[in-house]
A protein has these predicted regions:
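N-terminal alpha/beta PP-like core and its mobile active-site loop of ThDP/TPP-dependent enzymes
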Residues: 1-145
């Protein structure tokens, strides 16, 4: 059976021992949330009131548990709202992975609704633009931590 991008993300999170993720749902990550529901016996999702809170919660969780903090946000303002929490974790060498959505590949560079190049805002990001690159990128991040 061929897995889609959301299923690949969930499988790798479980494989890497992730049992808790923080986030705030939005249009471009709804497929991830659909899959997380199917994994709710293995991954607990903590819903926050704002993406920035989710980012700081993932940072705090990583500091308190020694595990990698994982945060999920949608495209555009959802992803930019993660920046302060990501920067805090980065500056203190706290292991954290952010999963964000984006507009469809065909819409990139066309000033689409909620299109933001988050990689340009966060220099320590390894962006993924296709399902085939998701496993490599996630394994790279988890191997760093």
């Amino acid at each position: 059976m061929q897995l889609n991008g959301s299923q690949i993300i969930a499988e790798i999170l479980v494989e890497q021992g992730v049992d808790t993720v923080f986030g705030y749902p939005g249009g471009t990550v709804l497929n991830i949330y659909d899959v997380l529901y199917d994994y709710s016996d293995r991954i607990t999702h903590i819903l926050t009131a704002h993406e920035q809170g989710a980012s700081h919660a993932a940072d705090g969780y990583a500091r308190a548990t020694g595990k990698t903090g994982v945060v999920i946000a949608t495209s555009g303002p959802g992803s930019t709202n993660l920046v302060t929490g990501l920067a805090t974790a980065y500056m203190d060498s706290v292991p954290m992975v952010a999963v964000t959505g984006n507009v469809s590949t065909a819409q990139i560079g066309k000033d689409s609704f909620q299109e933001v190049f988050i990689g340009g805002i966060t220099m320590s990001v390894i962006p993924s633009t296709s399902c085939t690159s998701i496993p490599v990128i996630l394994f790279t991040w988890f191997s760093i931590y």
